[in-house]
């Protein structure tokens, strides 16, 4: 592993209804970046906020000599799509992603950059003393284990978005045009050298988590279907096992019928229906998984943009780019500073 020279660092932060957190976020992130020995930019992507987050970001970007770049999406597309929009607009040799809720400290940015300089393609983080509720922690642990086994990359906390990516990894992710994207897993599929560090995890001071139960369900299906075909293989194994059990159960019923006679066969009707419902339920689960894969294939084949950038505002106090969509080649979407 060789050292990686860094001249410019980009911080990409997706923002959705974070009006109360933004002043502190902007102050702390800029202060942390000033400890870097590199030029930097802070790209904040408003993901269709319903409060005045977009206006706050634009005001910050319009300051004289401001390090902030405001990327305004026309509506809400989700956290990972917003980060991809930020990737298209940033120009750093190393790109740091950070959530806007301040649960992960921006003060960790210099440490991640230092590790990236050592030659790591991806620097992940693990939340110590996690402050989320139990109903968020346990599903996260299960998902982390499942992802590790399906991808073969042993990283402990895929849910923590405070991460550093080398430019080549970012460009590789931008070249992937699928709509259902989970960035940490996608990045690790291209990375050769990865590492993890422990970071603090604070309680959310303002607002609630933007991941509703339905969004968590959608995220789970994205994780299952976007990076592996293992569930389809499991369906084949389960289907074969159910068919074998069905044959064995039918043989058992015939034997019991011969031993106990016709009256017993009549009494066993409800058992037969119970087994039938189990098999039918298994079939519907399999059909649902197949539907998820086919639905995502359909979305990718249509090749619609993953997001639509309404405008990009930089420190020149003018709108640099308007009406940019993600269907354009990533390199064509970049805007000169």
From Swiss-Prot:
Localisation: Cell inner membrane
GO cellular-component term (any): plasma membrane
Alphabetized GO MF terms: phosphotransferase activity, for other substituted phosphate groups; undecaprenyl-phosphate 4-deoxy-4-formamido-L-arabinose transferase activity
A single BP term in Gene Ontology: lipopolysaccharide biosynthetic process
Catalytic activity: UDP-4-deoxy-4-formamido-beta-L-arabinose + di-trans,octa-cis-undecaprenyl phosphate = 4-deoxy-4-formamido-alpha-L-arabinopyranosyl di-trans,octa-cis-undecaprenyl phosphate + UDP
InterPro entries according to UniProt: ArnC_tfrase, Glyco_trans_2-like, Glycosyltransferase_2, Nucleotide-diphossugar_trans
Topology versus the membrane: Multi-pass membrane protein
Similarity comment: family membership: Belongs to the glycosyltransferase 2 family.
Known role: Catalyzes the transfer of 4-deoxy-4-formamido-L-arabinose from UDP to undecaprenyl phosphate. The modified arabinose is attached to lipid A and is required for resistance to polymyxin and cationic antimicrobial peptides.
Protein name (database record): Undecaprenyl-phosphate 4-deoxy-4-formamido-L-arabinose transferase
Natural source organism: Pseudomonas savastanoi pv. phaseolicola (strain 1448A / Race 6) (Pseudomonas syringae pv. phaseolicola (strain 1448A / Race 6))
Lineage per the UniProt record: Bacteria, Pseudomonadati, Pseudomonadota, Gammaproteobacteria, Pseudomonadales
């Amino acid at each position: 592993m060789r050292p990686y020279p860094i001249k410019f660092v980009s911080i990409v932060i997706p923002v959705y209804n974070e009006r109360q957190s933004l002043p502190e976020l902007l102050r702390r992130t800029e202060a942390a970046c000033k400890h870097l020995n590199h030029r930097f930019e802070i790209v904040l992507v408003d993901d269709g906020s319903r409060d005045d987050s977009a206006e706050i970001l634009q005001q910050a970007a319009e300051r004289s000599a401001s390090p902030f770049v405001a990327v305004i999406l026309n509506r809400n597309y989700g956290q990972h799509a917003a980060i991809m929009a930020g990737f298209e607009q940033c120009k750093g040799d190393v790109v740091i992603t950070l959530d806007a809720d301040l649960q992960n400290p921006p003060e960790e940015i210099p440490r991640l950059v230092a590790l990236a300089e050592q030659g790591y393609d991806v620097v992940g983080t693990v939340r110590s003393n996690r402050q989320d509720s139990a109903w968020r922690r346990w599903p996260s642990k299960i998902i982390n284990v499942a992802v590790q086994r399906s991808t073969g990359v042993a990283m402990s906390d895929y849910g923590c978005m405070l991460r550093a990516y080398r430019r080549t990894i970012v460009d590789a992710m931008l070249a992937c045009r699928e709509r259902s994207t989970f960035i940490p897993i996608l990045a690790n599929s291209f990375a050769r050298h990865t590492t993890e560090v422990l970071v603090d995890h604070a309680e959310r001071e303002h607002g609630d988590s933007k991941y509703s139960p339905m969004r968590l369900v959608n995220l789970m299906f994205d994780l299952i279907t976007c990076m592996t075909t293992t569930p389809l293989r499991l369906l084949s194994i389960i289907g074969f096992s159910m068919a074998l059990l069905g044959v064995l159960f039918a043989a058992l019923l015939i034997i019991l019928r011969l031993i106990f006679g016709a009256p017993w066969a009549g009494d066993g009707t409800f058992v037969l229906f119970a087994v039938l419902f189990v098999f039918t339920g298994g079939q519907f689960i399999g059909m649902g998984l197949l539907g998820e894969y086919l639905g995502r294939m359909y979305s990718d084949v249509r090749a619609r943009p993953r997001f639509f950038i309404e405008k990009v505002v930089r420190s020149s106090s003018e709108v640099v780019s308007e009406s940019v969509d993600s269907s354009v080649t990533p390199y064509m979407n970049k805007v000169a500073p």
